[in-house]
Amino acid sequence: MSKQRKLTEADVTPESVFYQRRKVLQALGITAASLALPHNAQADLLSWFKGNDRPKAPPGKPLEFSKPAAWQAQLDLTPEDKVTGYNNFYEFGLDKADPAANAGGLKTEGWQVRIDGEVAKPITLDIDDLIKRFPLEQRIYRMRCVEAWSMVVPWIGFELGKLIKFAEPNSNARYVAFQTLYDPEQMPGQKDRFIGGGLKYPYVEGLRLDEAMNPLALLTVGVYGKTLPPQNGAPLRLITPWKYGFKGIKSIVHIRLVRDQPPTTWNQSAPNEYGFYANVNPHVDHPRWSQATERFIGSGGILDVKRQPTLLFNGYAEQVASLYRGLDLRENF
């Protein structure tokens, strides 16, 4: 049996971000020999479980929500401190602990979201309006990162499709485009490309309209019974549990119904690595690592990290497979 090749930082980190990190370290005069751990997804995971200076999320406000039985999956939850302390949110830094450390000052009071485009009723709503208009419910979802780690999270929100129906899309609407807040003063990664991984900001994402209308697609305002902390995408983020986590755009300010497929940030950055669809698929590897298995982040320490098989559509094939009937999932990854 041949030995499995060891993963390097370049193997598990997007190439553009990998080289940005190297530039940052060089600018700071930090050499490889002086680093205790390489800054990549695997090392971030190791340092997290060591418990060194783990950042604490700011306290959230309690939310009122229902718990529909159909959405309370009997799965082992990832502990709250790991859900809120191990994140990708490059607007606040490249390492997993950076968002919790740097996002605490994000101003979310009076936050507004604009819904427009190919709709009969364009409207701007603040976050309180959304919560009052669309009753909240808790849904326990699997979450799978493209970096081959996973969590199980009790999100609180409402179906994206309900908001879309409220805006009354017209016959030209075929896709839904999303945009994150653009505020370099609050989000240092937008101001400094070394901090933000060299991505083009604001962060943008998109779905086909039928994907957006699927009941699984959730506009999320809370987690673990409280409002979202900034590092998790406060005050409003998208959750599409059958897709890789980078599709879950955070801190949304604009939702637009459009005719043509919208650009998406990671697809623009590295189209050979990150497709528009980004459906979880154990049979379609990332060009630099396998997607056949994943590391589940649970309640244990580093020795207890569970490696498990990746499920097609992250275990939600029954609900979403029909959306892609006749579509080559290798070509349309």
From Swiss-Prot:
Belongs to the MsrP family. Its EC number is 1.8.5.-. Part of the MsrPQ system that repairs oxidized periplasmic proteins containing methionine sulfoxide residues (Met-O), using respiratory chain electrons. Thus protects these proteins from oxidative-stress damage caused by reactive species of oxygen and chlorine generated by the host defense mechanisms. MsrPQ is essential for the maintenance of envelope integrity under bleach stress, rescuing a wide series of structurally unrelated periplasmic proteins from methionine oxidation. Heterodimer of a catalytic subunit (MsrP) and a heme-binding subunit (MsrQ). Mo-molybdopterin binds at residues 87, 90-91, 145, 180, 232, 237, 248-250. Predicted to be exported by the Tat system. The position of the signal peptide cleavage has not been experimentally proven. Keywords: Metal-binding, Molybdenum, Oxidoreductase, Periplasm, Signal. The keyword Transferase does not apply. The gene is msrP. The keyword Oxidoreductase applies. Its cofactor is Mo-molybdopterin. It comes from Serratia proteamaculans (strain 568). Residues 1-43 form the signal peptide. This is Protein-methionine-sulfoxide reductase catalytic subunit MsrP. It is an enzyme of class 1 (oxidoreductase). It catalyses: L-methionyl-[protein] + a quinone + H2O = L-methionyl-(S)-S-oxide-[protein] + a quinol; L-methionyl-[protein] + a quinone + H2O = L-methionyl-(R)-S-oxide-[protein] + a quinol. One of its GO terms (biological process) is protein repair.
